[in-house]
Amino acid sequence: AAQPLVRESYKNPISTWETNVMGTINLLNTIKDFKSCSIIVVTTDKVYENNSWNYCYRENDLLGGHDPYSSSKASVELAVKSWRKSFFNNKIKISTARAGNVIGGGDWAHERIVPDTIKALIHKETLVLRYPEAVRPWQHVLDPLYGYITLAEKQIKKQKSYAYNFGPDDK
């Protein structure tokens, strides 16, 4: 589990860091004595230093994050890398998966575009967009999920663990 909302991270930065970073570290520490397994830790595409480039971020781009959510998730990336190199010794395959904005069933969180639109329509209220000029690449939640499962299967066979980006086609 994680604290998944940027705006919530401003309201509760300590809780965000405790949940996202220490929650992951506790999990990593628990599995370090396993004989073998394949783990995918899902972070976010917001782990990158935001340089406002005109291309999609690549896995080896600089990590950063100016808000508590993004920087805590970048720290999760570093924790996974540290445990991979310090404790796992190829017996535990662990990769990070960085996905962007997803839509799909089960997401009724506050301040999410699809649930907020549905709620506004049901209650005949005006939908308020936080950043109407923003353009975001959306993908259905099952698309990256399929990728995570495929990655977990492949990393068991190939013994390679890295960071991977999951996003929609650039169309």
Stretch-by-stretch model annotation:
Residues 99-106, 128-139, 161-171:
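Glycine-rich Rossmann NAD(P)(H)-binding loop
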Residues 5-9:
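Serine-hydrolase catalytic-loop signature spanning alpha/beta hydrolases and amidase-signature enzymes
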Residues 115-127, 138-164:
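Alpha-helical substrate-binding/gating segment
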Residues 1-4, 43-45:
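Conserved NAD(P)H cofactor-binding loop of Rossmann-fold oxidoreductase domains
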Residues 11-29, 33, 37-38, 47-102, ...:
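Catalytic helix-loop patch of NAD(P)-dependent Rossmann-fold dehydrogenases
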Residues 15, 22, 113, 143-146:
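Residue-level recognition of oxygen-bearing side chains
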